[in-house]
Design a protein with these regions (language model features):
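N-terminal, charged low-complexity regulatory/assembly segments
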Residues: 29-31, 50-65, 73
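Active-site environment of non-heme Fe oxygenases that use a 2-His-1-carboxylate facial triad
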Residues: 2-47, 52, 97, 101-103, ...
């Protein structure tokens, strides 16, 4: 069976590569799909979303900001075939995370840290997504166990920051393509089962998350999966020359124009849904009024969005 991600299958890779590059160059507007009702996308809207995700592994959604509610998000993602949620540390009972910069003394409704701090010493401000600081390139859930990897996620903007907060997005398949073209050894190193280790997260003697060891690139049910963080702290790379070379190539990749980085400052009513593509975020400045501060809703899934 043809597998373009098998380094020994040169012909299968060449065919896949040609098909992949047909869609590029592309702009963020090429990902855009207006959706009238988030809780009930029409067959045409669903088809348009899946078509973009099939090509780019992501789509941009435009909806009425008032429609961005927990149950609407769950209905929308179920319409795309996503069922198994990833109940991460600060998600609510429906697996929805409210992403905002943590405030020590929240007073307004909608502040994500109001009553959401778990026991054991973990606080929202300890985690970069819940601050106004920049987020380096990563895929979601890179610290999850191998059998609990994040396959897809959605992210919707309820309120924008006063300034900043630009997202960068790169299709992980395009990253794979450029790295493999540079050297198949990069792929071999990053596909090693011990390529990237994330130490356990322990606070006050309580293990909040076990250690995670695994590859950067893997193939799951025939599809490419990427597990990556550009962070310098709390990550351990396999100590080999090939791994260091592959890491350096990845670092260079993020400034290359031919990897086709999509950039977006999300506005209220805009959303992203993706098969866990590479993404980053610049720092931002919030409004002093908590009721006007940046707020996004996110759900992670163990499933992947499949083409019809």
């Amino acid at each position: 069976m043809d597998n373009p991600f098998d380094l020994s299958q040169i012909s299968a890779y060449s065919d896949w590569r040609a098909r992949k590059l047909e869609a590029y160059p592309a702009e963020i507007t090429d990902l855009r799909v207006p959706v009238r009702r988030l809780d009930e996308p029409t067959p045409a809207e669903r088809t348009a979303l899946k078509a973009r995700i099939d090509i780019f592994n992501m789509a941009m959604v435009e909806v009425d900001p008032a429609g961005i509610q927990t149950q609407a998000l769950l209905s929308f993602t179920r319409a795309l075939g996503l069922q198994r949620t990833d109940a991460n540390l600060f998600a609510d009972a429906s697996a929805v995370s409210r992403i905002a910069a943590s405030r020590r003394n929240p007073s307004a409704e909608g502040c994500v840290d109001a009553g959401s701090e778990p026991p054991g010493g973990a606080t929202l401000g300890d985690f970069l997504p819940y601050t106004d600081k920049p987020l380096s390139w990563h895929t979601d859930g890179y610290y999850n166990a191998p059998d609990e990897q994040v396959g897809a996620w959605c992210l919707f903007c309820v309120r924008a920051a006063r300034d900043g907060g630009e997202n960068g997005l790169i299709d992980h398949e395009m990253a794979y393509l450029r790295l493999r073209d540079e050297s198949p050894q990069h792929i071999a190193a990053l596909a090693h089962p011990q390529a990237l280790s994330i130490p356990a997260h322990v606070q006050e003697g309580r293990t909040l998350r076990a250690a995670s060891v695994g590859p950067v690139f893997s193939v799951r049910q025939g599809y490419l999966h990427m597990r990556y963080s550009a962070r310098a702290r709390h990550v351990i790379w396999r100590d080999t020359p090939d791994t260091y070379a592959a890491r350096a190539a990845l670092d260079r990749l993020f400034s290359r124009p031919d990897v086709f980085t999509f950039k977006l400052v999300m506005k209220p009513g805009e959303g992203l849904v993706s098969n866990n593509v590479l993404h980053c975020r610049t720092g931002f400045a919030d409004d002093e009024d908590p009721s006007k501060s940046r707020l996004l809703y996110r759900i992670r899934f163990l499933d992947r969005i499949l083409a019809d």
